[in-house]
A protein has these predicted regions:
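N-terminal secretory/targeting leader peptides
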Residues: 1-156
Length: 156
């Protein structure tokens, strides 16, 4: 299964063999049988990649990644050299971009999911038992990873 990050560690604890393929390789890997399933993005992105042509089940919710954060990284010295006005422009532009991206993304998902159903994709939901199992394994992974000082600092 294509998976990444802590979610991959959870799936491995549940007996799943995971692979961290780049997004552009998912379709081909599914088509060739190199992987049987994939976690990736949201329904609109799945549609753009054509995943409905090869994957016939889509499970919700995405328990491992409740949101995606876009970021703009600016060198500290470059930031310090900017005027307060330019810093404010950049901050507000980023906020507006995030707001727009979230709103557009959420607005289009229902139509995209309806289209996926028309293309034969079954929309399924994880049972409460499966979500509890994911949570239990997630907690185990976090305890193990917390032995690393940097992980512990970031996670807490």
């Amino acid at each position: 299964m294509r998976f990444f990050g802590l979610g991959a560690s959870v799936m491995e604890k549940m007996g799943v063999s995971t692979s961290q393929l780049p997004g552009g390789e998912i379709f081909g890997a599914l088509e060739k049988g190199a992987i049987d399933a994939s976690e990736f993005s949201q329904p609109a992105i799945d549609q753009r990649l054509g995943l409905h042509k090869i994957a016939k089940y889509n499970y919700f919710p995405g328990w491992h990644q409740q949101s995606t954060v876009f970021e703009l990284l600016v060198n500290k010295d470059a930031w310090a050299d900017m005027s307060p006005s330019n810093q404010a422009i950049l901050e507000n532009t980023c906020k507006a971009s995030m707001t727009n991206s979230i709103a557009e993304g959420e607005a289009m998902q229902f139509d995209v999911m309806a289209n996926a159903k028309k293309n034969g994709v079954e929309i399924r939901y994880w049972s409460d038992e499966m979500l509890a199992a994911f949570k239990s394994k997630w907690d185990e992974v976090v305890v193990e990873k917390s032995q690393d000082a940097f992980f512990n600092k970031v996670h807490r």
